[in-house]
């Protein structure tokens, strides 16, 4: 077998060949280091399911799976009778045109309520119903469950969600977050093996300092908080960043190139296209399948 050492070129110009190889090596290393560190393969996360249905309903969530989402982000709060239901708002005025609060209605009443968005009509699901539907359809897509705390009921909400998840053997398909840091920390204390993040709304100053050392598994931030310095700091602290709500494909690519690990979007089909395109053209090192990561 012919090797470099006995080639004619090397014998005649050893210094030139050595210098050329060194230059190529430096270029390759530079290209590698230029790529931002990404803590796991980038995920497409459908915001409240997707735009293709009434938010947080069966239609929007099942369509998110069909459109290529890795996860559907859903909002979960408690009904009057303590059942986790999937709805974002504290009242029904926007989606059902009713002057009723979620906390004052039973799960049965809520599940019978029609909600509307554009040409779509659907009903409010319970978390239990939704998980059963996903499992029945053998849906690979998981759920990013946001705990919507009302009147300091974070611990009760977390306990109820734990019950539903474990009853349905859905531990490996779900990840969790909340705007309420106390609830995040409580859920961490109860199920430290679960993938639990903090959703930040408003000033990013709230997340500096000791938060990086509190075992947060990921951060979900608004678009305007996804700066180069912030994402780099998060990645250095081994905290993946998911950015919301990004609906423009070119912006999705920009955030992925910045080093974010998840795109939360109303259009999971656009997200799927952007992530697949990004993965074809980039060679990041992925810290994948670390402790606590769900199967995906």
Residue positions per predicted region:
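Phosphate-group recognition and catalysis centered on beta-loop-alpha active-site segments
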Residues: 1-296
């Amino acid at each position: 077998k012919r090797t470099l050492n006995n080639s004619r070129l090397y014998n005649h110009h050893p210094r030139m060949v050595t210098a050329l190889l060194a230059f190529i090596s430096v270029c390759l290393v530079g290209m590698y280091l230029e790529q931002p560190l990404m803590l796991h393969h980038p995920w497409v996360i459908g915001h409240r399911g997707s735009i293709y249905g009434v938010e947080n309903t069966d239609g929007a969530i099942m369509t998110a799976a069909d459109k290529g989402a890795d996860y559907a982000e859903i909002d979960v709060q408690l009904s009057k009778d303590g059942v986790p239901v999937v709805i974002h708002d504290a009242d029904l005025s926007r989606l059902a045109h009713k002057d009723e609060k979620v906390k004052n209605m039973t799960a049965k009443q809520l599940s019978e309520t029609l909600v509307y968005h554009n040409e779509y009509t659907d009903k409010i699901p319970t978390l239990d119903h939704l998980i059963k539907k996903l499992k029945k359809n053998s849906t690979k897509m998981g759920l990013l469950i946001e705990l919507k705390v009302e009147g300091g009921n974070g611990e009760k909400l977390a306990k109820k969600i734990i019950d539903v998840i474990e009853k349905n053997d859905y531990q490996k398909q779900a990840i969790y977050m909340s705007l309420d840091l106390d609830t995040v920390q409580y859920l961490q204390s109860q199920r430290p093996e679960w993938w639990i993040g903090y959703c930040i709304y408003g000033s990013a100053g709230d997340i500096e300092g000791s938060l990086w050392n509190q075992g947060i598994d990921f951060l979900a931030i608004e678009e305007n908080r996804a700066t180069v310095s912030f994402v780099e700091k998060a990645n250095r602290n081994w905290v993946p960043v998911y950015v919301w709500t990004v609906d423009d494909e070119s912006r999705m690519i920009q955030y992925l190139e910045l080093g974010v690990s998840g795109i939360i979007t109303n259009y999971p089909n656009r997200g799927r296209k952007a992530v697949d395109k990004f993965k074809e053209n980039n060679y990041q090192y992925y810290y994948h399948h670390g402790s606590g990561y769900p199967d995906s």
